Every structure is written in C-alpha cells, then in structure tokens.
Design a protein with these regions (language model features):
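Non-catalytic ligand/cofactor/substrate-binding and regulatory segments of enzyme domains
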Residues: 1-134, 165-199
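Non-Sec secretion/translocation targeting segments of pathogen effectors
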Residues: 199-213
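A structural signal for well-ordered alpha-helical segments within the folded catalytic domains
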Residues: 134-145
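Sec-exported extracytoplasmic/periplasmic mature domains
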Residues: 117, 144-149
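Short conserved catalytic/interaction loops centered on acidic-Pro-aromatic/His motifs
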Residues: 149-158
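Extracellular LysM carbohydrate-binding repeats and other cell-envelope/extracellular binding modules
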Residues: 161-162
Length: 213
C-alpha cells in the first residue's frame, strides 16, 4: 500500500515559464487537494489567470479540497477547481504516514490567513524588473517551507519569484511544521480549531480562504 504524499507540480505557461503548486495525494494516488498562490482581484475576491495591475491584484494563497471526505473532515466544501493536467512535470516532495503528511499540509493551511492578510501586490504579468518578485511561485516556496518539505525546481522552465518568500525567514520558522506526537498528528485540523484564522484581518477573500482551509 502506498503512503500519502505531497507532490510539487508545474503548470507550463507559454512553453517557457511555469506556475508551481502543491498537490495532496492519498495512498492510492488520488488528488485530495491543491494549494496555490494566485493573483486575486482585490475588489471581487476572485482569482485570475495572471495579475496585470498591481494596484488591483493581490497575491493570495488558495486551498482547493477535491475529495468530499477530506473536505468534510476539515469543515470545507469540496471544490472542483483544479490546475492538474496530464503530462505536467511533477516531483514527490514528501511521503509517509497519513497523519504526518496531513499535519505537514495543515501547517500550511494554518498560515494562510497570515499570508493573505499581508495584501501583497501581485506584480504586473508576474514579475518585477526592479526589486524582488513576489508572485505565485513565491507562494509555492513559502507553502513548501511551511510544510517542511523540499522545494524542487523544474529545469528548462522560467520560474520568476521561486527564490523569494511571502514572509520573513523568522516568521516562516515560527509557523512551519514540526514533528508531533502520534496523538497530536491524529487530531483533525479545522479552521475553527485554530485561533489564528479568527484573528487575521478581514479582506475580500478571507471568507473564501476560511471556508476552503
């Protein structure tokens, strides 16, 4: 029987660039959920394919639980939104006991309200000519470091922002996954059980994030 796993994948863009994201898989290899950083319209709270106006578009973390049982376990509604496509480059970043893998995944979910509360501008067309680029690939790195898994690169694809994070290093260290006792790992994470979700500043998208994480 296979272990649960956390997989890194790359959605190829225009043949040369890529949007990296995370997939949670069960022991049969089924995709239970996806984690993304996406450009999001500040006024409507909806994600968009690419940010084109830094004044209007912000970087947000999004969680899409696909499996009904998993969604129910975390108090969310199943969401069919998916960036999975056949033939995408993929790397398994972690595999193992179900409770350990879920604990890693949920460490990222717990940090989402803080990530989104920063209301970071999404750079026009995904990159900045001057200054650090903080974009969807930066969210990918941040979420991976929060889960305590290796953050792979994908050769032969441009990934602007992959070397940057959404939070300072010391804050990531404070929030990241740490080894837990078996009893703690087996506790089911729900947003209501985590005070940080309720203390985060409210934004147009915050209700969606709480309902999906």
């Amino acid at each position: 029987m296979r272990d649960h796993s956390i997989e890194a994948r790359l959605l190829c863009i225009a043949g040369i660039a890529g949007h990296a994201y995370w997939v949670l898989r069960d022991e049969r290899g089924n995709a239970l959920a996806e984690l993304h950083g996406l450009a999001t319209d500040r006024h409507t709270g909806t994600p968009i394919p690419i940010g084109t106006d830094a004044r209007r578009h912000a970087l947000r973390a999004w969680h899409y639980p696909h499996d009904a049982d998993y969604a129910n376990a975390i108090g969310a509604q199943p969401d069919r939104t998916s960036y999975l496509r056949d033939g995408q480059p993929a790397r398994t970043a972690a595999s193992g006991d179900k409770h350990e893998i879920l604990a890693r995944w949920h460490a990222a979910l717990r940090a989402m309200p803080e990530l989104n509360a920063q209301d970071l501008d999404y750079p026009n067309y995904g990159f900045k000519l001057f200054g650090a680029t903080i974009n969807s690939n930066s969210a990918f790195r941040t979420l991976g470091e929060l889960m305590g898994v290796p953050v792979p690169g994908f050769p032969r694809r441009l990934q602007p922002g992959i070397g940057n994070c959404m939070l300072p290093r010391e804050r990531i260290e404070a929030l990241r996954y740490r080894e837990q006792s078996v009893q703690d790992r087996q506790r089911v994470y729900t947003p209501a059980s985590d005070a940080s979700c309720q203390e985060a500043p409210k934004h147009a998208i915050s209700q969606h994030i709480r309902s999906n994480s």
